[in-house]
Amino acid sequence: MARLAVIPTIILALASSSPALSQPDTDAALLEQIRQDVSADRIEKDIRTLVGFGTRHTLSETDSETRGIGAARRWVYEEFNRISAACGGCLEVSYQSDFIEGEKRIPNRTEVVNVIAIQRGTMDPSRYVIMSGDIDSRVSDVMDYTSDAPGANDNASGLAGVLEAARVLSKHKFAGSIVYAGLSGEEQGLFGGKIMAAQAKEDGWRITGVLNNDMIGNIEGINGVINNTTARVFMEGTRMNETPEEARARRFYGGEVDSPSRNLGRYVHRIAEEHIPNLDVMMVYRLDRFGRGGHHRPFNDLGYPGVRIMETNENYNRQHQDLRTENGIRYGDVIEGVNFNYAAKLTGLNALTMAALSRAPAPPMNVSIEGAVSPDTTLKWAMPNVQGTGNLAGYKVYWRLTSEPTWTNSRYVGNVNEATLENIVIDNYLFGVAAVSKDGFESPVVFPGPAGDFYPFHPTKP
């Protein structure tokens, strides 16, 4: 359980005449090495293997060694173990499951099984960042568990990205823990995510972010657009489990666009902007596509920060379709619809984001703000007293105009727990604080108050 570290209070006025403190340089070489290590060829091989199981429908057979979701999940388990063997046993590989029945899309008792691999952090192992992809697939009839459902893009591409990220990141050490998750039951009702999120809450995980990868390989949209230089990150606004008291505070003090998920999405956007050539990330202020859902949602439902990363241009002729040709149009989620280089680019985005998040210190907690009827704005915060604070260098305050989507102004203030921005009027800007490691990696920015709190299940009061 998180407690608060005692840090001397230093009020630091950031007037233009004040000497600027130097933030440690980010280890950009590490991120570039990770980006270059991602292999489109390995991703293609994994997608072809997953497609080769015929169908991966959640209700499909589990006894066959060559067909169905049972064979597919066993292969994923074995692949994680092969990756672990290559890094000297650095991954903890396990199955995670529960029985589901009486549901519209799972009427009969069915075991929904996830495959999880954990790369433990060296300094703060109880802090987690999660990358997920889905094992299961479907055709037009969501209850058809016998027809071929290759699911090449939806979602073998996302699961292959998870496996490739594990191969690349397992070569390195990180302060926080990284979780690589193959989730099942997505098409039947997000059950794999529900199982994992509930277990994470029960086990007291401090989750900095969930990166749900669902369809990361298509570049040819049904609208005729062909584009391999953009991606989308979907991120919810107000927390699902916000209390009436928290809603009232948000109404008066703001935070509608600064939930932890929104600031996690901004983090992903910044990683792409600074480290991924020819990739523009579109930040979409929605939980998911219009009226639709993905495996980040069960985590959001419990208050955890999570986003969906995916292609920009979808082709609905290739989603949830029986394999067929009608009026000269080929339907079905087949391997020919996947661009492996693009899938590798989005896998790299995930890998770099997880590397930066896991190298950074834990996000600050108890972030508060004051400055009404004053020319100045003061931010205060604390660092949770958990393992891993030894890599903390200091903090960085951020601010932006209320109409701006990303953080545009910042100042590194050192290892203090309070900073005053002189002549920055509180009414005109939004504010936040990030923790910075000794090798220059930053946590996500934390907006003041409950609306921006990254610790929904841990004490946020001294």
Region locations from a protein language model:
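Metal-dependent peptidase/peptidase-like ectodomains
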Residues: 183-297, 302, 306
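Beta-strand-rich modules
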Residues: 421-443
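Active-site-adjacent mobile loop/cap segments within catalytic or ligand-binding domains
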Residues: 51, 216-237, 283-359
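Conserved aromatic anchor
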Residues: 375-390
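Alpha-helical metal-binding/catalytic segments enriched in His/Glu/Asp
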Residues: 117, 131-132, 136-137, 141-190, ...
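Extracellular fibronectin type III
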Residues: 438-462
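Short beta-strand segments within Ig-like beta-sandwich modules, predominantly Fibronectin type-III
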Residues: 409-416
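A non-catalytic alpha/beta surface segment that caps or lines the substrate-entry region
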Residues: 34, 42-120
